[in-house]
Amino acid sequence: MKIFFAVLVILVLFSMLIWTAYGTPYPVNCKTDRDCVMCGLGISCKNGYCQGCTR
């Protein structure tokens, strides 16, 4: 069970790394720049979407 949990944690961490490095596969809606914090620092909200987060 510990091995399964360790593998699961590693998969989650790698998926989060890929998410932040390459953006999301779908547009992230926002109203202000503060809504784009999950995409990284300095990402701006333009036309209702986080620009640097969306592919």
Swiss-Prot record:
Tissue specificity annotation: Expressed by the venom gland.
Cysteine-cysteine disulfides: 30-45, 36-50, 39-53
Stretch forming the signal peptide: 1-23
Superkingdom of origin: Eukaryota
Transmembrane segments: none
Keywords: Disulfide bond, Secreted, Signal
Keyword hit for Nucleotide-binding: no
Principal location: secreted
Name the record gives this protein: Neurotoxin BmP08
Record's GO cellular component terms: extracellular region
Miscellaneous information on this protein: Negative results: does not show any effect on Na(+), Ca(2+) currents, nor on voltage-gated and calcium-activated potassium channels.
Compartment(s) of residence: Secreted
